[in-house]
């Protein structure tokens, strides 16, 4: 197995590529992977590198250690970074850039969750296409206990997943929800025992990585357009991507492999 590590400016993030999977790790375990501003800056670099590398078929993000995915923003930085209008503007710009990097990623993104997934950590997990949590996962948005405001953009995905009633309970109570509760409300795709988490994520990532990249890309794009307001949908972009699938070498390979009763070897072209 070939492993390629990305050199990053911060020790609080790690990134590597192995077997067609890009792994992005939030590496601040002493603070339960609380998100520092420099970690948001690194997200832009990491996802940009994964997007540009044809060897990466799918991306998995995870927290270091066994206590947390991301426990939220690093509140110890608030005084330095968010106590003035200028500081908040800078912080918001960095966070917005990370958000754009997530939205620009055309490859499937899986969130692998253990332990705390709170506040900004839950917002980060909601950027994923698929969320798999161990049964020790804990979820919350404690903004109401911190005096923070959440805008429409920050709540759009949450409401689309769990509906307005559960979104209200999450936001207004600021309480913690168990992994079982998160699964029942549709906040996560799957809840598995702690011991089964690695295998479940590895299996799913491998399945996606083995599929035709152009088809996977087109499917992700189409689903993203479906959940938009009708007047904001870019249907022409999706149609172009679908046509690219039918014109691809992989379409020929897929049909040939089916007829020959073998596994296809897709190239992404």
Predicted feature locations:
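Amphipathic alpha-helical segments at domain termini/boundaries
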Residues: 1-27, 175-209, 217-226, 254, ...
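Glycine- (often His-adjacent) and acidic-residue-rich active-site loop
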Residues: 63-101, 147, 230
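Short, active-site-adjacent cap segments at secondary-structure transitions
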Residues: 66-70, 117-119, 140, 223
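Helix-loop "lid/cap" segments that line or gate small-molecule binding pockets
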Residues: 170-171, 222-226, 240-246
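Charged catalytic carboxylate motif
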Residues: 38, 42, 94, 101, ...
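Terminal peptide-recognition signature
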Residues: 24, 28, 43, 61, ...
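Crotonase-fold acyl-CoA enzyme core
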Residues: 101-214, 247-248, 253, 262
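Conserved CoA-thioester-binding segment of acyl-CoA-metabolizing enzymes
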Residues: 1-62, 100
């Amino acid at each position: 197995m070939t492993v390629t590590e990305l050199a990053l400016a911060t020790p609080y993030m790690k990134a590597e590529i192995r077997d067609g999977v890009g792994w992005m790790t939030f590496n601040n375990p002493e603070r339960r992977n609380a998100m520092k501003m420099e970690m948001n800056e690194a997200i832009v670099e990491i996802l940009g590198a994964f997007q540009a590398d044809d060897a990466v078929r799918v991306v998995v993000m995870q927290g270091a250690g066994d206590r947390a995915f991301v426990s939220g923003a690093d509140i110890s930085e608030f005084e330095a970074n968010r106590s003035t209008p200028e500081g908040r503007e800078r912080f918001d710009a960095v966070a917005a850039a990370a958000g754009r990097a997530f939205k620009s990623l055309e490859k499937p993104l899986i969130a692998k969750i253990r332990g705390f997934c709170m506040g900004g950590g839950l917002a980060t997990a909601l950027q994923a296409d698929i969320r798999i949590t161990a049964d020790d996962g804990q979820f919350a948005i404690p903004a109401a206990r911190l005096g923070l405001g959440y805008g429409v953009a920050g709540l759009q995905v949450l409401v689309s997943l769990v509906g307005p009633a559960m979104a209200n309970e999450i936001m207004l109570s600021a309480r913690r929800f168990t992994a079982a509760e998160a699964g029942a409300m549709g906040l996560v795709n799957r809840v598995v025992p702690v011991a089964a988490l690695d295998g479940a994520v590895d299996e799913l990532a491998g399945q996606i990585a083995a599929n035709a990249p152009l088809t996977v890309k087109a499917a992700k794009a189409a689903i993203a357009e479906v959940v938009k307001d009708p007047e904001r949908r870019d249907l022409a972009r999706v149609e172009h991507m679908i046509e690219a699938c039918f014109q691809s070498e992989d379409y020929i390979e897929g049909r040939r492999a089916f007829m020959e009763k073998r596994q296809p070897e897709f190239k992404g072209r």
